[in-house]
Structure formats: C-alpha cells, structure tokens
C-alpha cells in the first residue's frame, strides 16, 4: 500500500530510505496489534454503520439501498470501508449562514 508520502516522493524523484520503509511497516504492525478485531461484533458494526450514515445524511442525500459497509484486511491492516452513493447535496450551508446572521443580530 503506497502512502501519500511515498507518492509525493515518487513524483518528485526522491527515493524512500529503507529506514523510513521499515518504520512505516512497524507502525502498521503495531497499529494492527493494538486493535482487537474480535471485539468488533456484528452489533457494534451495525451501530457504527448507523452512526456513520446519520452523520453523512446531514449533509448529503444517500441512496440507502446501495450502501455497503465492510471490514477489509490487506497486508495485516484492517480498514472499515463505507461505500455511500450520494444522490445530491443538501443545502444546509444556506441555513447555517442565515442562522449565523440571526445570531449576530441578536448579539448587537
């Protein structure tokens, strides 16, 4: 898995040192070892999925029929992957601007 730092170094023609590569690999191993995957029960994953969807749905309209949330493990690293198809954005920004203006008027 290429990190952002690796990509930038590659684009700039820099080579990563073996020490940096070893350090990054060790950090991944330590992070993986700290996470007890057995503690991620189906109930906990369902709760996380619901909370993620609730937060994202505040800002965009989601196609809930096509939502996919999964755990993927690759190279000793586990990731929570959420595929959230967006139908359209919600114009919450206008509401915030109006609310901010109202709050400023009240303070005056």
Curated annotation (Swiss-Prot):
<dbReference type="InterPro" id="IPR005527">
    <property type="entry name" value="MinE"/>
</dbReference>
<keyword id="KW-0131">Cell cycle</keyword>
<keyword id="KW-0132">Cell division</keyword>
<protein>
    <recommendedName>
        <fullName>Cell division topological specificity factor</fullName>
    </recommendedName>
</protein>
<comment type="function">
    <text>Prevents the cell division inhibition by proteins MinC and MinD at internal division sites while permitting inhibition at polar sites. This ensures cell division at the proper site by restricting the formation of a division septum at the midpoint of the long axis of the cell.</text>
</comment>
<dbReference type="InterPro" id="IPR036707">
    <property type="entry name" value="MinE_sf"/>
</dbReference>
<dbReference type="Pfam" id="PF03776">
    <property type="entry name" value="MinE"/>
</dbReference>
<comment type="similarity">
    <text>Belongs to the MinE family.</text>
</comment>
<dbReference type="GO" id="GO:0051301">
    <property type="term" value="P:cell division"/>
</dbReference>
<dbReference type="GO" id="GO:0032955">
    <property type="term" value="P:regulation of division septum assembly"/>
</dbReference>
């Amino acid at each position: 898995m290429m990190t952002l730092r690796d990509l930038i170094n590659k684009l700039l023609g820099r080579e990563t040192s073996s020490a940096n590569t070893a350090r990054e690999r060790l950090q991944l191993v330590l992070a993986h070892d700290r996470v007890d995957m057995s503690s991620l029960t189906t109930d906990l994953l369902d709760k996380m999925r619901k909370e993620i969807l609730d937060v994202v749905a505040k800002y965009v309209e989601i196609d809930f029929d096509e939502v996919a949330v999964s755990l993927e493990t690759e190279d000793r690293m586990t990731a929570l992957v959420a595929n959230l198809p967006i139908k359209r954005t919600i114009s919450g920004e206008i509401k915030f601007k109006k609310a901010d203006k109202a709050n400023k008027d009240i303070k005056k």
